[in-house]
Regions:
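Divalent cation-coordinating acidic motifs and surrounding scaffolds
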Residues: 1-269
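Amphipathic alpha-helical coiled-coil/zipper oligomerization segments
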Residues: 270-320
Length: 320
């Protein structure tokens, strides 16, 4: 099961009104079972509806459902977190709008995380919590550190630590230094596993090669549920053979993605290494079945013959 986060860069009417851009976005989203889209800025909601309709028109076998936050932000500029997920692959079992002011930490987040909880139907991990992030660049260190408290709050609220934090962390370049990264609790706590390396370019622009977009999971159970080496950016410019100009019309970020192991294709071998399970074949030996049927016929004929002999003997003893 593939999960992704995508900062789509000011998603609104202008994006969906361009058929080429809309088509590319649909192709990107269609790669995933769950995707959270950042920077949804259309207050009317029409662009969201347009995308959902185009997505389901393009995906006949898998129906997508939408779950979107309220408009978030301190100023007139607002954004929404938009989740799109295949409802034959997961069930939405919980949603929660975190409010940092109610948590006692003050107004830390420019956009408070909108957190969803899913029951996964076909993966080794049944319970999954997704915490999306889009930090304000100049406050990214403080916001990322606060995510530790968000995690603890969710762990207590929902009694689970199967948590994935994903989104645009803005934790690179001039925003957060390597020294400052060490101060961030979800970085210094070794129970948190950062799946996207520090030297991975997640931007579509050739003007920089920063690692802004990240995926972080908590605990060994979550880490073991991840398909090895599946966490990476998806270079849609290369995959769809777009020019840089065409790619930047879609977004200045790449989606970052990860895959959870399927319950039907993994087994544990004696060495503790998980491998793909080979299909189990049920073979019917038709020759053997035919032989058994033949034996039954012979037994029946033998029985009929014995009955005929017995009748003949009875007739001799009792002549008419």
């Amino acid at each position: 099961m593939k999960i992704a986060s995508f900062n789509i860069q000011k998603f609104g009417k202008n994006k969906v009104s361009d058929p080429d851009v809309l088509n590319t976005v649909v192709k990107i989203v269609s790669r995933y079972d769950i995707i959270v889209i950042l920077e949804v800025v259309d207050a009317s909601g029409t662009s969201v509806t347009t995308l959902l309709e185009a997505l389901n028109k393009s995906n006949r076998k898998h129906h997508y459902t939408l779950k979107i936050s309220t408009r978030l932000g301190r100023t007139r500029y607002k954004e929404q977190f938009m989740f799109l997920y295949r409802d034959d692959m997961v069930d939405l079992v919980g949603s929660y709008q975190f409010d940092d002011e109610l948590s006692g930490e003050g107004d830390v987040f420019a956009r408070d995380p909108y957190i969803l909880r899913f029951r996964c139907l076909n993966t080794v991990l049944k319970d999954l919590v997704l915490i999306p992030v889009h930090t304000k660049p100049e406050d990214s260190e403080k916001e990322l550190d606060e995510l530790y408290d968000v995690f603890q709050h969710i762990k207590k609220k929902w009694r689970t630590d199967n948590v994935m934090i994903l989104g645009d962390f803005n934790a690179d370049g001039s925003y957060v230094s390597k020294r400052d990264m060490k101060k961030i609790r979800i970085r210094s706590d070794k129970n948190f596993h950062w799946l996207i390396g520090d030297d991975v370019d997640t931007t579509a622009s050739t003007g920089n090669n920063h690692t802004y977009d990240r995926i972080v999971v908590y605990g060994d159970d979550m880490l073991k549920a991840i398909v090895p080496n599946s966490a990476k950016p998806f270079n849609f410019q290369e995959a769809f053979r777009l020019t840089e100009e065409q790619a930047l019309e879609v977004s200045d970020h790449y989606p970052v993605e990860v895959e959870l192991k399927s319950i039907t294709n993994t087994i544990d071998n004696p060495d503790g290494v998980e491998e793909e399970e080979k299909p189990r074949l049920v073979v019917v030996d038709e020759d053997l079945m035919e032989l058994k049927r033949g034996n039954l016929l012979l037994e029946r004929e033998k029985l009929n013959l014995e009955i005929q002999i017995l009748r003949m003997k009875m007739a001799k003893k009792n002549p008419v």
